[in-house]
């Protein structure tokens, strides 16, 4: 279940810090540093931040922003604290369907570092909604000297007038 992240702020920050200097942090932050979200109480109606909770246990964090003027969702971020828990994907997918069907958003864009284990799920979502995937080759080098691609997804939703 998605609940406002502010309710789990300290727990989310602690959980994310447990992944400092790890490959998981690299995939979340998109660089070699450690990134902590700034979980806000006042999000001005454009920043959405959620704790993903299962039976009272924090299992993930999901965030995105909406530019209401251009009807675009961007700045998506997802961190799983309970690998292989399908409820994370189910809850995030429900939120994405709400964005599409209730908010009638025109466009969603998100980015990731190639090799992220969730890439196959992002590809599936992109295919389902006839989106596009752009791969920029060897954009990022990790601590071990391995190059990773940068991946950009975009999906445009045609609205009936």
Map each language-model feature to its residues.
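Conserved active-site tyrosine of GNAT-family acetyltransferases
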Residues: 121-129, 153
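Conserved catalytic-core motifs of GNAT/GCN5-like acyltransferases
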Residues: 111-112, 127-148
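Conserved acetyl-CoA-binding loop-helix of GNAT-fold acetyltransferases
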Residues: 85-102, 119-120, 124
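A short, well-structured alpha-helix characteristic of acyl/acetyltransferase catalytic modules
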Residues: 1-38, 159-161
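Short hydrophobic/aromatic beta-strand or adjacent loop that forms the aromatic wall/cage
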Residues: 47, 148-152
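Conserved GNAT acetyl-CoA-binding A-motif
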Residues: 102-114
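Acetyl-CoA-dependent GNAT
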Residues: 26-74, 80-85
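Alpha-helical elements of Rossmann-like donor-binding domains used by nucleotide-donor carbohydrate transfer enzymes
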Residues: 11-18, 91-98, 152
